[in-house]
Amino acid sequence: METVLCVLHDEDMMEKLVCLQNEVYRERGLHFTKDGFRHWYIDNPDGPAISCNAFDGEKMIAHVSLEPEKMLVDGQIVNCVRAMAGVSHPDYRGNRLLSKLSNIAIEEAARQGYSFVYGLANGNSFPGLVRYCGYSFITRLNVMMGFGTEIHEDGEKTYRRYWSEDALAWRLSRRNYRKVGSSILGQFKPGIETFMGTLESQSQLQIPDIHNYNPFFPHLKLYVGLGAKLPWSYVKVPKFIKHSPFNLIFQDLSGGKLPMMTKDNVFYQLLDFDVA
């Protein structure tokens, strides 16, 4: 097995990543393209992804990536990375490949000067990331449904995403969204919209022109996030409706210069990561 740390500018490397992802998610009917990975891994205005990959000969068998972002931490703009992807080929599981690749990628992020790494781990990857990769578990994001867009930050939080106009335009460029005041909504399923987030804390930010759509009737809203004050009309999604848990994990790379992230000092929204 060979381990390679790289940025995926190479077309051959990108093609191998697409083949791996499509094999891993084939039974779920998901299909990945090089164009999609270029968007997330190369075009990001905050910087190219840190990618760490394992090979068996010419075949990519495991992949981990960290996505550069900016956050406001105690009012200061801080460069960080988010653990975005971690996949391994079904034939090569059981030997902690993802943990090994994650640690290499995290070391590289620290070397490049990023202040912390965080992620939203699903039920499969969460135990290994906490046990073997130095992450601390913070909390699970709230998953709720209701009506209305009067969703606001619940007090002033220590950690929140910082958007430049270039980064926001990039984030909103690939799907259909609409603006309601300072809030952004997205299409999810018939009759349901995602509440992507509010940008009221960055009121000076020019929200870019987006691919507006206009529903004919009020839609139910899906909210995923942390640290918000929601209207009374929102309720937790019942346990019998299955969804992947969003386990928020954190690792400081600043040598203790930053305050610890806690479940009470974070404002986080769907807009801030890549699932919708």
Please state what every model-predicted region is.
Residues 31, 42, 51, 97-108, ...:
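Recognition helices and adjacent regulatory flanks at domain boundaries
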Residues 13, 37-39, 85:
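Basic, Lys/Arg-rich alpha-helical nucleic-acid-recognition elements, primarily the DNA-binding modules
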Residues 88, 93-107, 203-217:
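Conserved acetyl-CoA-binding loop-helix of GNAT-fold acetyltransferases
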Residues 3-17:
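A short beta-loop-alpha structural element at the N-terminal edge
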Residues 51-53, 59-68, 82, 87, ...:
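Conserved beta-strand in the GNAT
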Residues 27-47, 55, 110-114, 123-205, ...:
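Amide-forming acyltransferase catalytic core, primarily the GNAT-like/NAT-type
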Residues 117-156, 192-276:
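Active-site/acyl-donor-binding loops of N-acyltransferases
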Residues 17-21, 25, 102:
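Hydrophobic alpha-helical core bundles mediating ligand binding, dimerization, or RNAP-core interactions
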